[in-house]
Amino acid sequence: MALALMCGRRQLLCLLRPQRQFHSVAGPCQWPRKPLTAGLGFPADRCLGHPRYVLLMAPGPRGLSTSAVSFGEAQVPAPPVIPATPPPTAVPEVASGEAADVIQAAAEQSFAELGLGSYTPVGLIQNLLEFMHVNLGLPWWGAIAACTVLARCLVFPLIVKGQREAAKIHNHLPEIQKFSARIREAKLTGNHTEFYRASSEMTFYQKKHDIKLFRPLILPLTQAPIFISFFIALREMANLPVPSLQTGGLWWFQDLTLSDPIYVLPLVVTATMWGVLELGAETGMQSSDLQWMRNFIRLMPLAVLPITIHFPTAVFMYWLSSNMFSLGQVACLRIPAVRTVLKIPQRVVHDPDKLAPREGFLKSFKQGWKNAEMAHQLQERERRMQNHLELAARGPLRQTFAHNPLLQHGKNDPPNTPNSSSSSSSSNKAKSKQPWRDTLG
């Protein structure tokens, strides 16, 4: 019994020990196989009287080869091979501001769709602004400034001509002031002879030297249509409004369709306009040349400030650009080399004793008001005298003596005798209250 058990244990240990013959090899599988216990019989004569069998239900973990392919796995089709996805190509980065500008330009409506732009002066300016903004890529404030500089460059020849005339007037200013003083005194005193004599002499002097006092003022007036056209064009664009104009500003005035929230632009424009007029950047005549012009120039910027303070910032952008161009222009035209190239006469420095004394603003204003009142009184008196003369020429002759000299007096009574005087007074007693009704003939 003990020997049989010992033999059975040895056979069992042999079965449990990993062997090469128990490894499955790759290849077609042959089923059914012989039972693993077919050769595991134990002889009865050694162990027991009847045979014993041991069945191994599962192989050990080292009994299976990792390179084996089972029958079930051989029947399953291999999955399709999916090619690896290539990495995305590098896309050049675009700045956010440029991308926004491109998108906005693509989505922005044209001025023709918005009802702006035409062949009128206002429409042509709007078309030019649209070209600067859309085609050249300038922001709205830059487009307005560029169009302003372009317009000012076109009228620059007229400004140069005005500078020439202003230089002539300044060089002959002492003689002009003398003639003006004579004319003013003759007008105040009512001396028509002296008035016409001084006026004729002044006219002859101006023709001799080719001087026209109002020519420097007329030439810059050609800029008035340009300014009005720019003003109307920008105001229409702001009132519509153009969508991109609401974000085309600068610094604190990003929205060009609204007025300046802190009123900096109106004040700066007023200050620059005063400097332009005071320096004579447009006319070439400094404010010290003519007294009445100096007073008018100093009052005009302050007078227009309450009217223009609520204008859209797009209008102020044009106005500020124009004023800055004018200040740079007057600084450039004061260079002697530039004046020589442009054939502008040099300004003569006059002796202060030969010029009329300058008065203060209030004193000159009061004197001018007084002179205007006196001139009005003289004109009123002349008008009344002229009316009396016309009435006397059209109406009947008025009697200017006590009796009618055409009446025949008595032969014995001379005209100056008491009888004649009594007879004449008795005959005209009824008409003595209204002697002017008597007429000759």
From Swiss-Prot:
User: How is this protein positioned relative to the membrane?
Assistant: Multi-pass membrane protein
What residue ranges lie in the Mitochondrial matrix compartment? 135-139, 234-260, 320-441
- Where is this protein found? Mitochondrion inner membrane
Q: Which CDD domains match?
A: 5TM_Oxa1-like
Q: Which GO terms describe its molecular function?
A: membrane insertase activity; mitochondrial ribosome binding; protein homodimerization activity
Q: Where primarily located? A: mitochondrion
UniProt topological domain (Mitochondrial intermembrane) ranges: 1-113, 161-212, 282-298
PTM-bearing positions, type Phosphoserine: S364
| Keyword terms of this UniProt record | Membrane, Mitochondrion, Mitochondrion inner membrane, Phosphoprotein, Transit peptide, Transmembrane, Transmembrane helix
The segments labelled Disordered in the record are 405-441
* Keyword Transmembrane helix tagged: yes
Membrane-crossing residues?
Answer: 114-134, 140-160, 213-233, 261-281, 299-319
Positions where Phosphothreonine occurs in the chain: T400
Source superkingdom: Eukaryota
Q: Name one GO biological process term.
A: mitochondrial respiratory chain complex I assembly
Q: Low complexity: which segments have biased composition?
A: 418-429
Asked if the record carries the keyword Phosphoprotein, the reply is: yes
**What is the documented function of this protein?**
Mitochondrial membrane insertase that mediates the cotranslational insertion of integral membrane proteins into the mitochondrial inner membrane. Essential for the activity and assembly of cytochrome oxidase. Required for the correct biogenesis of ATP synthase and complex I in mitochondria.
To which protein family does this belong? Belongs to the OXA1/ALB3/YidC family.
Q: What is this protein called?
A: Mitochondrial inner membrane protein OXA1L
Organism expressing this protein natively: Bos taurus (Bovine)
What broad taxonomic lineage does this protein's source fall under? Eukaryota, Metazoa, Chordata, Craniata, Vertebrata
